[in-house]
């Protein structure tokens, strides 16, 4: 899979996005789904919220009105971003992108986060681990919510900036949509020539 690496790029100024959602200087643990469910990790984020320090906040994008009513106050719930740039700003502002999915094939959100210079922390499940290397994030065992948070804290301790260049370089080498389209065309040509 490929993504638009011009749209999903490192945004260096996170002041506006932090002000918009009243995030202050907190470490942002970002989660994103088109529809949140148990399988996408909604319950895992709620559990994680009970373990947060004062300087940490969870930001979840894609939350329904009904889910917003039930989330604890240390989870900032966003229905939808206004545009792709705002999404790239959120990815870039985050200390880590956490994808606690219980089943997924090859989540595009992981690619988008890495392209924006943000390391990914995910469960060892399906294709969610395929874009995560030791330079682009952490993989923890499925259901280990404490392990997810510990990985985020390791990123924060080391300094997210230490991951940014490696994440972006990995995205440029592996996620360019034009390159992936060319790969698909070659594959189709090879199949049809036989």
At which residue positions do the language-model features occur?
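Conserved donor-binding/catalytic core segment of Leloir-type glycosyltransferases
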Residues: 23-40, 46-50
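Short hydrophobic beta-strand element within catalytic cores of glycosyltransferases
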Residues: 119-122
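Short acidic/histidine- and often glycine-rich active-site loop of Leloir-type glycosyltransferases
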Residues: 69, 125-139
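A short, well-ordered alpha-helix in the C-terminal region of glycosyltransferases
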Residues: 161-174
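Aromatic "clamp/platform" in nucleotide-sugar-dependent glycosyltransferases that forms part
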Residues: 102
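Nucleotide-activated donor-binding/catalytic signature segment of Leloir-type glycosyltransferases, i.e.
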Residues: 62-85
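Conserved acidic donor-binding segment of nucleotide-sugar-dependent glycosyltransferases
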Residues: 80, 134, 138-145, 154-160
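Short alpha-helical donor nucleotide-sugar binding micro-motif in glycosyltransferases
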Residues: 89-94
């Amino acid at each position: 899979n490929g993504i638009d690496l011009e749209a999903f790029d490192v945004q260096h100024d996170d002041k506006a996005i932090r002000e918009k959602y009243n995030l202050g200087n907190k470490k942002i643990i970002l989660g994103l789904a088109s529809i949140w469910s148990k399988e996408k990790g909604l319950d895992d984020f709620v559990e994680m919220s009970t373990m947060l320090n004062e300087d940490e906040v969870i930001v979840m994008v894609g939350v329904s009105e009904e889910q917003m009513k039930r989330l604890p106050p240390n989870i900032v719930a966003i229905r939808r971003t206004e545009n792709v740039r705002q999404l790239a700003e959120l990815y870039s502002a985050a200390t880590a992108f956490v994808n606690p999915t219980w089943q997924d094939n090859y989540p595009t959100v992981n690619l988008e986060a890495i392209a924006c210079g943000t390391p990914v922390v995910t469960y060892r499940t399906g294709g969610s681990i395929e874009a995560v290397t030791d330079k682009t994030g952490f993989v923890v065992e499925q259901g280990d919510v404490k392990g997810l948070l510990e990985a985020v804290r390791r990123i924060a301790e080391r300094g997210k900036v230490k991951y940014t260049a490696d994440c972006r370089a990995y995205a440029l080498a592996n996620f360019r949509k034009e390159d992936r389209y060319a790969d698909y065309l070659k594959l189709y040509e090879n199949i049809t020539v036989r």
